[in-house]
Design a protein with these regions (language model features):
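A C-terminal functional module that forms or caps the active site or interfaces directly
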Residues: 1-99
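Short, flexible loop segments at boundaries between secondary-structure elements
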Residues: 102-105
Length: 105
């Protein structure tokens, strides 16, 4: 699930969603950035790179999604990435992985 909005609100909402899933006994993963990585409370938190580093985000996305599969997480939450050059391709891949579920905050 993608969560879009102002960074502090996104972090807070993802942490709420993580707690809800964990209370149900589910393992949860979060795709974060270097800037927000330490602010999450999920079972598996992975930084995709610096928010402004489009190349790193694109390079790490598939690897991170495979890692979550390997870890058998039940739910994945991700920050949204609006980057001008390759951002649309990144967002299209994330939207597909999220089953087009987007939560605006």
């Amino acid at each position: 699930v993608l969560v879009e909005g102002e960074t502090d609100k996104v972090v807070a909402r993802i942490n709420e969603l993580v707690r809800e899933k964990q209370q149900l006994g589910q393992k949860v993963g979060v795709i974060a950035t270097d800037e927000t990585f330490l602010r999450y409370e999920a079972d598996h938190v992975v930084s995709i790179g610096a928010r402004e580093d489009e190349d790193a985000i694109a390079r790490h996305l598939y690897k991170i999604l495979r890692e979550f599969d390997d870890w058998n997480v039940d739910a994945i939450y991700s920050e949204s990435f609006a980057t001008p050059r390759i951002g649309q391709a990144i967002m299209n891949r994330l939207l597909k992985a999220a089953g087009h579920q987007v939560i605006p905050v």
